[in-house]
Amino acid sequence: MKAREPRLGLTIGLVLLISLFGTASMAFSGLQGEYELMDGEPSLHESGKVILFEFADFYCPHCHMFEHVVVTKLQQEFGDKFESRMIGFPVMPGKLPTVFEMYNQAVTMGKGQKMKEILFQFIHNQDIHNFDKTIRTLVLKEVGLDRIEFEAGLASGKPFQTLGKNKKWGERIKVTQTPTVVLDGNIRIKNLNFDNLKVVIQSILDRDRKS
C-alpha cells in the first residue's frame, strides 16, 4: 500500500492539473475573432470593461494611425466599457526617451490621454522631435498642466523608472514591434484591424454578461 501511495497522489495531481487547464481553456473558448491567450500572464480584466494595452512608440507612424483611427472607433463603439492604455515602448532608433517620460508624468497628473494626443500631433503633424523646455512649455499649455509641478515630476526620475518597467514588461512578452496590442493583460491580438478587435472585445463583454 505504501508503495502505491505516491503513484496515487501523482495521479490525483495530474487529474487536478488537467482539470485546472481545462477550466481555463473553457473560460476563453467562447471568445470569437483572432487572438492568442498568453501563457503565464495574469488577467487584468475588470468585469464589464475591456482594457486595451497598446505597446507603442510615439515616433512610430503606425502607432499614430492606430491611435487616430482604430482606438478612436473602438472608444466610440464601446464607450465606458472600453479603456485604452498606452505603454511606452521605444523601438525607433536615435530618439531620446523624453516624450515617454512626459507621457508617464502626465498620467500621474491625470492628463495622460490629452498628453498622448498632443505628443502624436507635435511629432507627426508638426514634425517636432526635440522636446526641450521651450517645446515642453508649449505642450503643457495645450495639455493644461502646471509647468513647475510637471518639471519637478520629470526631475524626480519616476517617469523614467516607469519607462524601464514598461520596457521590461514588453521584453518579457516578446514585443518586437509597435503597435503591439494586449487585451486585459493576457490576450494578444495580432490582427489589429477594427473589425477583428471589435469582435474579440464584444465576445469578452458577452462572456461577462453570461457569467
Question: Which ranges hold each PLM region?
Answer:
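Sec/Tat-exported extracytoplasmic proteins
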Residues: 59, 70, 74-78, 106-110, ...
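Extracytoplasmic/secreted envelope proteins and their assembly/folding machinery
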Residues: 68-75, 99-103, 116, 133, ...
